[in-house]
């Protein structure tokens, strides 16, 4: 704690490799964390592969900062750190204080890991570790164990000062949200689409969400589930816009006039056409879906080819080759799985045929679609859409979830 504030040090991830765009990525990372923590007036700086964060020294500010760091894309790890002057005396004093605190918490052994980023410093990394470790060992606070220590004390000698920290928490890696443009996620209430959205967020893309419902055939709880999923994604992406479109009249028309095996695929074709209009309105440059090849009948190669032909925008399918167990594991890690398994149907499961078409031809499906004269219904669905802006929330109020 320095000057009444709490310091955090984070290791910047993949963006440090992008030399041509490095400063742009650093600025975006600074901006993202500053926006996440705007309620507590943080000081954020990124330089030389490290993110430096200073927040007020209060429980609420520290809780908010640590929760935001746990959702921040673009860092590989972070820790609460102690800043001190770049002298061996100051570094040793701070390290001894860390060791004493660890001993009070019941720790018995330690190891020093030192890194000298400033090559002008008077000691090498190994010399720093050796000298500081010797002082702690001789003081009797902790015993040395280089292989299986109870605590590791990290020392980093940076350009302007030194930082010491103990437990380092794992970051989410990836790229800062916002450096890769904007996409529109077709968000259902299932397990897959939220994971697909997270995958694109982790590649630096800002995502907005589109949900299709068929009220009263789908219950209000189904939409509430999707709203909760969008709130989770907004924590990783800072914010999102959720657009809700009713497909009730379109599904009635399909149920009455379309060939039964083609029902689901024709509905997907309608979704893609509406999604393109929503995407262009929101300046999204691509559509994102949770489709995984051959996972269900509507996701055969031929069916995906048909739906891709319904839009001029690229369709990103980040889960196309993913294993279902891997998808579930990711959903659990990011906090969407428990929401996704709530037992409420979405519009895609309504009126689903027992024997859906598996190997359609694009031309044949386009003929079927055109014969149904769905244009006015699609226009009505788009015209009556509803939008909600959702912001990521961080802090003490979130801790009970």
Swiss-Prot record:
Give the matching PROSITE patterns. Answer: THUMP (PS51165)
Compartments in which it is found: Cytoplasm
Q: Does the keyword Calcium apply?
A: no
Single biological process term from Gene Ontology? tRNA 4-thiouridine biosynthesis
Identify the residues that the record assigns to the THUMP domain, covering every copy. Answer: 63-168
What are this entry's molecular-function GO terms? ATP binding; CCA tRNA nucleotidyltransferase activity; tRNA binding; tRNA-uracil-4 sulfurtransferase activity
Q: Which GO terms describe its cellular component?
A: cytosol
Kindly tell me the pathway this chain contributes to. Answer: Cofactor biosynthesis; thiamine diphosphate biosynthesis
Extract the PANTHER family matched here: TRNA SULFURTRANSFERASE
Question: What is the protein name for this chain?
Answer: Probable tRNA sulfurtransferase
Organism name: Treponema pallidum (strain Nichols)
What is the phylogenetic placement of the source species in the record?
Answer: Bacteria, Pseudomonadati, Spirochaetota, Spirochaetia, Spirochaetales
Q: Which gene encodes it?
A: thiI
């Amino acid at each position: 704690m320095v000057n009444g504030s709490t310091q955090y040090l984070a290791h910047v991830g993949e963006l440090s490799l992008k030399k041509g765009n490095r400063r742009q990525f650093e600025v975006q990372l600074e901006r993202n964390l500053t926006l996440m923590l705007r309620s507590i007036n943080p000081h954020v700086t990124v330089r030389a592969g490290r993110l430096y964060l200073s927040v007020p020294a209060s429980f609420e500010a520290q809780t908010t900062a640590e929760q935001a760091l746990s959702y921040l894309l673009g860092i590989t790890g972070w820790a609460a750190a102690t800043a001190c002057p770049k002298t061996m005396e100051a570094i040793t004093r701070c390290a001894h204080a860390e060791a004493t605190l660890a001993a009070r918490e019941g720790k018995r052994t330690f190891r020093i890991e030192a890194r000298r980023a400033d090559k002008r410093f008077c000691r090498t990394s190994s010399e720093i570790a050796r000298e500081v470790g010797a002082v702690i060992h001789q003081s009797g606070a902790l015993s040395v164990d280089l292989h299986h220590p109870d605590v590791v004390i990290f020392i980093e000698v940076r350009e302007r000062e030194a930082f010491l920290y103990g437990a380092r928490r794992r970051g989410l890696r990836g790229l800062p949200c916002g450096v890769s443009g904007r996409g529109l996620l077709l968000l259902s209430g299932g397990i897959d689409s939220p994971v697909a959205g997270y995958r694109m967020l982790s590649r630096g893309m800002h995502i907005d969400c589109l949900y299709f419902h068929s009220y009263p055939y789908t219950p209000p709880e189904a939409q509430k589930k999707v709203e909760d999923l969008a709130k989770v994604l907004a924590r990783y992406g800072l914010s999102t816009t959720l657009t809700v479109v009713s497909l009730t009249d379109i599904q009635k028309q399909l149920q009455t006039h379309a060939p039964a095996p083609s029902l689901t695929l024709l509905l997907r074709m309608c979704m893609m056409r509406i999604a393109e209009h929503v995407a262009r309105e929101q300046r999204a440059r691509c559509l994102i879906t949770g489709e995984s090849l051959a996972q269900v009948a509507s996701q055969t190669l031929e069916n995906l080819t048909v739906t891709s032909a319904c839009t001029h925008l690229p369709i990103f399918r980040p889960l196309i080759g993913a294993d279902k167990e891997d998808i579930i594991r990711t959903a659990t890690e990011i906090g969407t799985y428990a929401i996704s398994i709530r037992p409420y149907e979405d519009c895609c499961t309504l009126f689903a045929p027992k024997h859906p078409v598996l190997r359609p031809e694009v031309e044949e499906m386009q003929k079927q679609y055109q014969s149904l004269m769905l244009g006015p219904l699609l226009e009505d669905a788009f015209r009556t859409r509803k939008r909600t802006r959702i912001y990521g929330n961080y802090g003490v109020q979130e801790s009970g979830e």
